Amino acid sequence: MTVRNILVTSALPYANGSIHLGHLVEYIQTDIWVRFQKMQGHTVYYVCADDAHGTPIMLRAEREGISPEALIARVYTEHLRDFTGFHIAFDQYYSTHSDETRYYAEDIYQKLKAAGLIAIRSIEQLYDPVKNLFLPDRFVKGECPKCGAVDQYGDSCEACGAAYTPTELKNPYSAISGATPIRKASEHFFFKLSDPRCSDFLRKWTRSGNHLQVEAANKMAEWLGEEGENKLSDWDISRDAPYFGFEIPGETDKYFYVWLDAPIGYMGSFKKLCTEQGIDFDQYWKKGATTELYHFIGKDILYFHALFWPAMLENAGYRTPTQIFAHGFLTVNGEKMSKSRGTFITAESYLQQRLNPEWLRYYYAAKLNGSMEDIDLNLEDFVTRVNADLVGKYINIASRCAGFISKCFDGKLVAGEDYQLLQQTVDEYFSSWQPGVIEAAYEARDFSAAIRHIMKRTDEVNELIHVLAPWEIAKDETRERELHRACSLGIQMFYLLSCYLKPVLPYTAERIEHFLNWMALGWPRQQAGQPLSTMLLPAGHTINTYQHLITRIDPKQIAALTEANRQTMTTSNDTHSLTRHAEAQQRVIAPIAETISIEDFSKIDLRIARILDAQHVPGADKLLQLTLDIGSEQRSVFAGIKSAYDPEQLKGRLTVMVANLAPRKMKFGLSEGMVLAASGESGGPFLLAPDSGAQPGMRVK
């Protein structure tokens, strides 16, 4: 086996708020993948850090009457506590407010400047004359210039959905001091992303080398534009004092924008680890490095990681990521997390309610498939699945067999001829097991496929134990050897299943290692042509007394959790603008279209359609060709959803189409209708999907 050298990162949580269950999707996903790779025997380092700079941190510290350094130190402790509670095993968890990150931020900036990729331009912004600072968009409020609604933010109106700049607001005021802002010009520093050296590199990098998922690469193609055009804009990388961050070298009262030094925090954190453990930093970061570098991120920050970041690294003489893995958002009970419903759940509250963190790790693993699709935490399904899969199926194997081994056989599994008979049973009954399928699913981050395969094998073990019925055999003293074989078989298969689940359930795996009296659950390796039985525990192996491993979820615990968060959040008055992502990506709602009559609407024939096939369209950057079943016939439709969907993931899905739209002749063929999808400034397209029970051909009314 070739040993791989791998560096893995998760996106840096902002040092201005609590970790919640939405954040944990990414850290659990990354941790599972890292643990799997380490079980393969590879050299893997997993680093992360608090994203500790920016205006929101500076202002919050001021409100609390403490220094920004004191604030980020406190939040760092809270974040690390929560991550540890969910068994996230970083090799290094650091802060961007560090000497290491400062060094690499300045180094990259100086190299970009020397390459002629830094430009200085004067821009006009709103300025708070009381606080003496320039106001980010979301720190300005006023009257909407379109509809006149009051108390609207500086970038968009929540009443009519209009988008605008802060300088267009009527009667603007500072959301910090209440003062009327003035217009003031200032010199800002820009990374010239539009330079052909960047745009040409990114066009090639995003489309080659499997650096991005298909959906992500398609989205990058949209942002880059068609061949021959350049839709990229230069990136403002500076902020004016007062600001909490790193000063730009050689400048006065100019600071690096938080999004410049945030990804550089990956380098700073790893450098800290290198210093502590004697690791060669250049082996992982120099241009041309043969080691592997993977970034796990949310799809909302794809723009920064797949455009700005690789362009900066390439032009500053560093290596670029091997791959960037983007995941979707978390919904709870099918809806956005809500403070009023108590579903905006913090990691701290989950742990304080004494819920097992591995329940959530398992549920997320069962949902994550390596794509950018959103995942839903359905709390009722959460209870059902954990209780049925983990307790009712998996743990049940050990609990039904271990007692007999300890009580009747002094903790020893079968040996000699009975061990050979056990091996024969394993190879005959479990011939369909495919350990390689589980391994491939973990490697591809398709944890849901891995869990499905493991649970199918778990069902097979339970079926055999049910047939053997050791609890019945135990009633007949003449069948002692048969009882010993049956229970030993259960324990042996429980051992294998535990090895496969160890990346997901690391704490339970440690307890199982004690129970099985086995130093460490390693990844079972089945050599080519070798039967499954060669991966079992040794003949005559002695186990320890069984102690209960995982308890069931009581639905009352979930009710208490949501109630605790509802009560906590109703007393919280944190402003919207305290998160970095509020600066990075704002939601703009399009205005409602002109009113139509019911007669006009009734002319539209909307039908449920099943996607029978989905294919790329040669020569089209944005289109997929869909073959739709609408009950009475099939239709071919061209849909502009290529940037968001892999064709293979669409097959079999239900959607909604306009069935009576006149066919449209396109250069790629005839489009016989239109599928419905949602999109906006914050993302999309998102294909509409009907509720379960809908059938192809049904009319939507």
UniProtKB/Swiss-Prot annotation:
Pfam families, per database record: Anticodon_3, tRNA-synt_1g, tRNA_bind
- Name of the protein: Methionine--tRNA ligase
Oligomeric state and interaction partners are given as:
Homodimer.
Q: Where in the cell is it found?
A: Cytoplasm
Instruction: Provide the family line.
Output: Belongs to the class-I aminoacyl-tRNA synthetase family. MetG type 1 subfamily.
Q: Give the record's GO biological process terms.
A: methionyl-tRNA aminoacylation
Q: Which GO terms describe its cellular component?
A: cytosol
Q: Name one GO molecular function term.
A: methionine-tRNA ligase activity
Requisite cofactors: Zn(2+)
What UniProt keywords apply to this chain's record, in alphabetical order?
A: Aminoacyl-tRNA synthetase, ATP-binding, Cytoplasm, Ligase, Metal-binding, Nucleotide-binding, Protein biosynthesis, RNA-binding, tRNA-binding, Zinc
Q: Where is this motif: 'KMSKS' region?
A: 336-340
Write down the EC number. Answer: 6.1.1.10
Q: Where does Zn(2+) bind?
A: C144, C147, C157, C160
InterPro entries given for it?
aa-tRNA-synth_I_CS, Anticodon_Met, Met-tRNA-synth_bsu_C, Met-tRNA_ligase_1, Met-tRNA_synth, Methionyl/Leucyl_tRNA_Synth, MetRS_core, MetRS_Zn
State what this protein does.
Is required not only for elongation of protein synthesis but also for the initiation of all mRNA translation through initiator tRNA(fMet) aminoacylation.
Return the motif ranges for 'HIGH' region.
13-23
Which residues of this UniProt protein bind ATP?
Answer: K339
**Domain called tRNA-binding: residue spans:** 600-701
Major subcellular site: cytoplasm
Q: How is the cofactor bound?
A: Binds 1 zinc ion per subunit.
Output the superkingdom of the source species.
Bacteria
